[in-house]
Every structure is written in C-alpha cells, then in structure tokens.
C-alpha cells in the first residue's frame, strides 16, 4: 500500500492580513493535491487543521471541496481527523469538515481497508483538549485493543505530544500504544523518527504559518510524506518527503552600506517578492524604502545605533504567550496549568467558570 500523510494546510489563513499570503496558502495546498493526483496513492491520511477557522471563507471551502472531489473521482480514499482549528466550540455547531463528507471519511473510530488482499487497520480521533486527557487515553486503549489482531496498523491524531512540543501538549509520548505508523498533525515542523517499533511522523504544515517556521522550512522543507507500506515492516527509508516551494522570507540586519548591499542581493535572488524581517538602522531606512516594490511586506524593525547589534531575543510573532503565562504564574505561586487552561478557555469562548469549579473541587474537596 502507498499512502500520503498530510496535515495543517490552514486554508483561509491571512498572514499579516495580506491577500497574497492567503493566496500562498491556497496555492501550496493546490500544489500538494496536484502532486498527490500524479502519484495516485491508495490512501490519503489528513491529520487535521485543513481549515484555519471554524468558519472559513467561502473560497477556502470551495478550494477544499474541489480538491477532495478530484481525489474521490480518482478513487483515492481519504481519511481525515478534525484539528483544533476546525473543532466546534459549542453544542449544535458543526465542523466545516462536514461539508466534505461525500468525498472523505471523517474519522472518529476505526476502519479496516483491504489493499491488494492485505488488511490495514486505520484508527483516529479528533483533537482533544488537555482537560479531556482521560477521555483521550480511554480511546487510545480501545484502539490498541481493536488493532491487536492486525499486523499493519495506523493511528491518526491531531495533538501536541511531549517532548515534541515541550509545553503546550495534551499527551505524553508514553501514552501512545504500539502502532506501525503514527500519522500526526498539529506541530508545523516535520518530525520523523522510529518510535515504539513503528514510525512516528508529523508531516508539518504545507506553508509557513508563522515566521519562526522559516528556518525549519529551509532545513526540512514543506509538503507531505509519501509512505510505501508494501513491506511487512516500516522503516524511515520507506518514507519520502514530497516538497513544495513556499514564499521566501529574508532576514536583514542593515547597519552599514555593506550589510545594505547584502540585503539587496538576498532580496533580488528571491523568485517572488519576499517577506522581510530583522533590523534596520534608522539612517538606512530611506535606503531600504527604495526596495519597497521588490518585497511583499517589510516586518523589519527600525532601531537606533545602540540596539542594532542586540540579539533578537524576542520574536513578537512567535512569542509563546502560554509559556510566559505559565512561567509568571509559577513564580507567583499560582498553578501554571490552571492559568494556561483558563487562558485557552477564554480564547475559545469556553466555560471558564466550570473549569474553576472543577479545579476547586478536585484540589480542595478531593
């Protein structure tokens, strides 16, 4: 069996509120679909966050429906699990994934497929918040039990798992039962390693969603995994990275004429207008402004002499607010996990009062 593992397309996302960046997201996704149609795998496994929002723009819905309809018409079976970005927040709400039900199987449970006379067990479930950890662990135990008689078995999840994401995780790596392949989503960088006698894989996002993903993109690329599961056991050598090109990001540190010329050369080497970030010494801002027609957007900060050589310790765009909240709470003698849970509840319009009541009853009433 040949299958594709893909995740985290975030259709509808508008980085810097730019039409061009929204289009980049769509173009990257469409290029992935084009490559999948050329490859003609038996199955596509999508590990969540197809959409960036519970209510994506009409264009995002149209592009997704057209893409999965094409896969369906070419007899390519698609399984998908819901990510945190497309999960309903209240009773009565539906995920936008429901609109794709004629073309994909939205997985919250198990399925067994037969490819060339061989049975493959596939199971998975939607994103679970950390507060639903016990429910998630019960599901994993059930999956493990149901899969025990199958040699080839795949688990699909959209979760943060420690240590692959050190703070904002919902599961520990030792929570995962033994499977042949772990088709994971949620973390935007590519991760591929042997684990539990199988292969653990985060396919990563298909575009640069946050600026701090650019360095990983240069090292590991963006796209999806193509997995050859025709042998009895899976090895990392059976997995191929299928890469696509993303818009380039250029870091600058302009403090003199030499560094300005270096920045110009970097920008002119780009295939399309890049996103620029970094630092520009104030006196060189007029120089840099002459390049505005060659860049998509300038996110570099203007600094005075005394700050030009200071290290960039804080990247506002990628700043981990959650980490700061937990660190501050712990230093104040407050339960950091509680603060983080409250932050998430407020962010997602969830019932924070119920969360506090549950915490109080558990902590003080046993």
Swiss-Prot record:
Q: Which residues bind Mn(2+) 2?
A: 49, 84, 158, 186
By its UniProt entry, which Pfam families does this protein fall under? Metallophos, Mre11_C
This chain belongs to which protein, by name?
DNA double-strand break repair protein Mre11
Query: PANTHER family of this UniProt entry?
Result: COMPONENT OF ATP-DEPENDENT DSDNA EXONUCLEASE, NUCLEASE SBCCD SUBUNIT D
Per the UniProt record, which EC number(s) apply here? 3.1.-.-
Organism classification: Archaea, Methanobacteriati, Methanobacteriota, Methanomada group, Methanococci
Q: Which GO terms describe its molecular function?
A: 3'-5' exonuclease activity; DNA binding; DNA end binding; DNA exonuclease activity; endonuclease activity; identical protein binding; manganese ion binding; Y-form DNA binding
Biological role stated in the UniProt entry: Part of the Rad50/Mre11 complex, which is involved in the early steps of DNA double-strand break (DSB) repair. The complex may facilitate opening of the processed DNA ends to aid in the recruitment of HerA and NurA. Mre11 binds to DSB ends and has both double-stranded 3'-5' exonuclease activity and single-stranded endonuclease activity.
What HAMAP family does this protein map onto? Mre11
Which cofactor is recorded for it? Mn(2+)
What gene is behind this protein? mre11
What are the UniProt keywords, alphabetically? DNA damage, DNA repair, Endonuclease, Exonuclease, Hydrolase, Manganese, Metal-binding, Nuclease
């Amino acid at each position: 069996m040949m299958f594709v593992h893909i995740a985290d397309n975030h259709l509808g996302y508008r980085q810097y509120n730019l039409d061009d960046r929204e289009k980049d997201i769509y173009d990257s996704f469409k290029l992935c679909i084009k490559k999948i149609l050329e490859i003609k795998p038996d199955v596509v496994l999508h590990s969540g966050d197809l959409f960036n929002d519970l209510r994506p723009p009409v264009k995002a819905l149209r592009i997704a429906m057209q893409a999965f309809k094409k896969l369906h018409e070419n007899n390519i079976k698609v399984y998908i699990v819901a990510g945190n970005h497309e999960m309903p927040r209240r009773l009565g709400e539906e995920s936008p994934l429901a609109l794709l039900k004629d073309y994909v199987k939205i997985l919250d449970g198990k399925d067994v497929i037969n490819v060339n006379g061989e049975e493959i067990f596939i199971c998975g479930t939607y994103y679970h918040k950390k507060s639903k950890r016990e429910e998630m662990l019960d599901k994993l135990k059930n999956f493990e039990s149901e899969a025990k008689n199958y040699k080839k078995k795949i688990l699909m999840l959209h979760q943060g798992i420690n240590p692959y994401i050190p703070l904002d995780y919902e599961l520990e790596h030792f929570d995962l039962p033994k499977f042949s392949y772990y088709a994971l989503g949620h973390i935007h960088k590519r991760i591929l390693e042997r684990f539990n006698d199988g292969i653990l894989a985060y396919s990563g996002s298909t575009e640069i969603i946050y600026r701090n993903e650019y360095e990983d993109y240069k090292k590991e690329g963006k796209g999806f995994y193509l997995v050859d599961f025709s042998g009895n056991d899976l090895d990392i050598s059976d997995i191929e990275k299928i890469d696509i090109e993303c818009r380039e990001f250029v870091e600058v540190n302009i403090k003199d004429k030499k560094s300005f010329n270096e920045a110009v050369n970097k920008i002119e080497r780009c295939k399309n207008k890049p996103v620029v970030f970094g630092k520009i010494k104030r006196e060189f801002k007029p120089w840099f402004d002459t390049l505005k027609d060659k860049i998509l957007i300038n996110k570099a900060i203007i600094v005075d002499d005394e700050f030009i050589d200071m290290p960039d310790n804080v990247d506002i765009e990628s700043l981990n607010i959650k980490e700061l909240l937990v660190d501050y709470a712990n230093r104040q003698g407050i339960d950091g996990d509680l603060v983080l849970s409250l932050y998430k509840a407020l962010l997602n319009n969830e019932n924070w009062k119920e969360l506090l009541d549950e915490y109080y009853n558990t902590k003080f009433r046993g």
